[in-house]
Amino acid sequence: DIAGLIRGASRGEGLGNRFLANIRETDAIVHVVRAHGDEGVVHPDGRVDPAADIEIVETELIYADLEQAERRLERVERQARGGDRVAIAEEAWLRELIDALRAGRPARTVPPPADAPRALAALAQLSAKPVLFVANVDEGSDVEPDAVAAHARDQGAVAIAVSARLEAELAELGSDEAVAMRAELGVGESGLKRVVDGAFSLLDLIAFFTAGEDAPAQSLHMRRGLSAWHAAGKVHTDMQRGFARAEVIGWEELVDAGGYIAARERGTLRLEGRDYVVADGDVVTIKFSA
C-alpha cells in the first residue's frame, strides 16, 4: 500500500525515493484514482480530475525510468563498442526506450528484444509494470469515468470502478443485508471481487484449490498454463520432488456431487500426470512419494 506520489517524487520530493523503491518490488500496480465528488475529502490541488492525477503518477514513474535507462545506456555503449552482440542489441533498444520515455510514453510500450534478456532485470522499469486503474467513484456507480477508461485503453491497461465509501458501509452489514443493498443500488459484484478479478486478468493468473477427503481446503494461485507439477511446488517442494499423480476435479463438479465419495462414484474425479495443465477453479489433490 503506497501513498500517492507527488510531483517531483522521481527527484526525491516528499517520500518519493522510498515509494518508488516499493513500487519497483511489485509484479503490477493497482492505481486508485479519485473520481468522486465528495467535498469532505480534500484534494491537494483543490479539484477532481482523474486524468490529471494519473498523469502526475505516470510522469514520475517515467522520469525515474528515464534516469535509470540513461545510466544503463552509458554502460552498455562501452560493451557494444567491444563487439558484445547482446550489448549491441540492448543499446538499440535502450535508445528506442529513451526516446519513448522522453516523449512521455511508458516503458511498457517498448518491449525489449528477445536477444537482450538481461535488460529488463537490470532496469526493473516502473512504467513497464502492468497497471490496473481503480476509479474510486460516488456511491451507486460501478462504471469507470470515461477519462479513466480511455486512458486504460490507450495504455493497454485494465480499468474498473469501485466506491470505497459504499464498500466500507457494506462491510458493516451482514451478508444478506449487503446483497440487498447492492441490488437496491444497482451495483453487482463486490468491489473486492472486481479488484481481485482485474488483478488476476492483468497478471494472467488462475486460482486452484488443494483439498482431500481428510484435508482442509486452501486456495492458491499461479500463472495460467502451468502444470500439475508446478501446482505441487506451490503447495510444498517435497510434493513437487516426489510427484506421482494428481486427483483433479472442477470445484463446481465437486460441489454438485456433494463430496469426494459421490464424485468418485460419478466418475468425475480423474487422475492426471505431471504435465496436466491446471485449469482455473480446479481442485487438485497431489499424490507423492516422500
How does the language model describe each region?
Residues 2-31, 36-59, 111-123:
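Switch II of P-loop NTPase G domains
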Residues 3-6, 34-40, 47-51, 62-63, ...:
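Conserved nucleotide-binding/hydrolysis micro-motifs of P-loop NTPases
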Residues 55-67, 71:
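Internal, well-ordered alpha/beta segment that forms a basic, Gly-enriched binding/recognition surface
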Residues 70-290:
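C-terminal-of-GTPase-core extension/linker across diverse P-loop GTPases
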